[in-house]
Every structure is written in C-alpha cells, then in structure tokens.
Amino acid sequence: MQTVTVNADIVASAHIPSIITKELKLATSAGRNRVRVSSNFLPFMGFEEGVRHTVEPLPGTYGMVLRTDAKGPQKVYSRRYASRRNNPFETQIEVSNSAMLAKCLPSDAERLHFEMRRGQIVIRPVDNRTFSIRKSIRGMDDPRTAFVALTGGVDVRCFRDAGFSIDSILEYRPQEARDKENDKTETGAVNCLMNAAPRVLINEDIFRVDMDRVRALAREGVPIGCLSLSLQCDDFSSAKANSLKQKSLRDGTSSRNMAYPALRLVEVVNPATVMIENVPAFGASAQYEMFRQILTDWGYEVKDAIMEAPEHSDLTLRKRFYMVASVFPGFEFPEALEVATDPLWAKIERFLPDCRDVSHSKSLADGLACGRARLITPSSTHSPTILKSQMRGAKDSVFIAMPDGTYRFPSNELLQFLNGIPDDMPFGRQSKDIESEIIGQSISYGMHHRLCDAIGQHLRAQQQPATMLRATQGLQLSLPGMFAH
C-alpha cells in the first residue's frame, strides 16, 4: 500500500486510489473566473507544494488537462487556514489566464468536475442543466411540445386543444387483481393513440422502464416544453380506506413511491416545465416535499396550487393539486372565475333517458344507509367528483336522485359531459368499464385546459424575437390557404 505525508505538521497514512474525483464551483475574483482546486488530495496524485505543471485544452471539447512537468509554467501552492484546527494546510492549484479559460470553458459554466490521476488532473465543465434547456426552448419556432406520462388519453387531448404538439407518451395500465386473465395494460395507451399522433409511445411500467433508453429516445426528438405527470393518486386519496392504504404498503403494491421514477423521468427528458396533477393530499406528503426540493436543486422555479373545478367553469366539484415547475421564472396559475349558481339539472336532462334505473340496487341502498352515496339532485349546482371506480357501483358512486323518488346511474356519455370532455373525443373499442375508468380517473377538462394554456403562454413568452417573428410569419403565410375553399 502506498502512503503519503500530507505535510510536516499533519502526517497521515492513507491508501491512494487510482482515481479521485471532485466537483467544485467555478471560482470568481474581482469579476473574473478562475479554476481553483484546494484539496488535501492533490499530494496524493503527485501535485505537492512547489511541483510545476502544464495546462492544456482538452482536444475537441470543453475542458483542460493539467500534467506534472518540471518545466511547466505553473506550480502548486499551499495555503494555511488559521481558523482550522483540523487539516489547516491544503495544497492549491489555480488557473486564471483569461484566454485559456475562454478556450476551455463555455460561457454558462458554473461548476467543474475534477478527475485526478497520478501526475494528471482532467477538468471538465459540468453541464448547466437549466441554461441548456432555456437555450434550446428559446430557439424553437413553437416551444409548446409535450411528453405526457401516466395518462389515459384525456389530458393528451387537452394538451392538443391548448395548442401543444404531443412528442411522446408513457402510458401503462398496471394489471389489477380484479382483471384476472384479462390483459388491460394497453387500454390507456390505445386510447392515447385515438387522440394524438405521438412520435414515441412507451407502453411500459414507469417503475421498470429503462430510463437510459428513454433518454436516448428523447434526444432523437425535439426539446420538450412540458412534461406532464399524473401520478397515481389512490394511496393519497380519501376515497381509499386507510386500512387498504396500510395493506398496500405492507404487500408492496402502494403507489406512493411513484414520485421517485417520476423524478428520474424529469432527469432524462430535461423539460422546460413539469406539471404534476394529483389529489390535494399529495401536496402535503413527504413524497411531494422531496420532489419539490430536488426540482429546486436542479434549477426549476416550483409553484403549486389547489385548483377547484367550479372556479374554472366546470360542472363537477373536483378539487386537484397542481404543481408547475419551470426553468423560466414567473409562471402564474390562471385566476379563478365566478362560480356558477344555477342548477345543473337543465344541462343534464337530455342524458337522463339513457341513465338506467338502479333504485333497487344493493350498492345504492348500502350507500344511502351509510351516507356515502353521492347524489345529483334537481337543485344541485355541480356534480360530485367522478371516481375511477364509478362503473363498479360502489357505495360512493355518483347517483341521480330523480324527482319521482327513483334513482338512476349516470351513463358514460353523461360522465364525459360532466367532466367537460369534448363529445367528439373517441374512446375506440374499449369496454364500457374501461371507458368509465378512463373518464373517472381523468381531469376536469376546462380547469386542466386553462392550466395547459397558461403553461403554453408562459413558454411562448420566453422565445427570442427572431423565433417569434418566424412563427408569426409562418402563421401569416398559412392563413390564405385556410380560406381557399
């Protein structure tokens, strides 16, 4: 084993690895950048006090290499830190030549990576994540591009209606115990393809997908303006009993840890903005606090809000937690609108003939008995929130209380209308159960559309004048053709 004496006062015997790495901030002094490394590790690699060395640019890329050389133009110094009781002496290397730094470092460099070997130190700039993202977005004719993950397809259509182009979709419906032998893993993905033409469809479990492969696929496409993440909400939702939440934690089926692969997706896609949609309880969870902190560390400005559907002209009482993180400061959530106070009944009457009578069903009786049944009445101004489990006829399903004392079960067409989903949105050849599930677990369309539109405007406001002019000219050139007929 090699040993080394760090200095005369502090003698330390230590194993010397073949390689030692560090990451340090680019130093500044008097308004000028300086590459400075002050470390006990320098003598380990032959850079003792007084040793001379060369400084040369790395060929073909940013960075520089320092090599010990008796005739080198620079030498290693030592510093003494009087305030330190532990290791007050450190050796130091500094490169301050402006011409060399301009050749070796990009203008946006903030941090440097040092790879130390015996007699050699390779210094490379660490990629400035947010600077690179901002630069790529500002150069686009239209930055409204989306990667939509964990979606049944409704929010895909919503992004399209808000002016976004859909570059990529990651959607995989996990098999549930009730599915038995019926494979439903492609149902949401098929619905997405009925409503968008993405460049890439990833029909893989977010917990198992190869993120390096996702990174490679993302690099083949355009920069992503918005990454949308509708994390599974079951284990945060008040609709799921606490006993079942605890059971899912014990048996490993809980979805509370989905925030981790979602962060990995942000890391490989490098979007300009990130949107999360979930139930309000998610915003108070430890998982969200972790998510928020890491995005902040990565250079995103993170904002969140609880949005309520009635305040955005929608017909249900759906309340949702939203987070929008952006590499561009200044995003603002859409302001609330006046809440409607007129009865909902007149708007839904045309759907009632197709809603089946369930007056004598056990689920209704049980729901009424325990107070969990959620009713639309002739005086209701809004519908209760539609749930993923609606079609199963659970105790907490939404029922319609008719004026004659009977009860009806909402048709899928009515559920679609209540959630504000356009009536021309196709669901393909899905079963009614899957169609209801997609509708119930989706979004309050008008509210979500207003947020997508706000994100789109936020992205377009960052464009450089030249790209804005190109986009405007392109629109003007296309207008005559629109009226050719």
Language-model segments: what does each one mean?
Residues 1-37, 43-45, 202, 221, ...:
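Hydrophobic, helix-prone linear segments
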Residues 2-21, 26, 31-33, 41, ...:
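C-terminal target-recognition/interaction regions appended to catalytic cores
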Residues 38-42, 155, 309-310:
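Eukaryotic intrinsically disordered and solvent-exposed regulatory patches
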Residues 135-265, 270, 280-284:
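Core alpha/beta nucleotide-donor-binding catalytic domains of modification enzymes
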Residues 43, 160, 296, 437:
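Short polybasic/polar patches that bind polyanions
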Residues 215-221, 236-393, 404-406, 477, ...:
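Class I S-adenosyl-L-methionine
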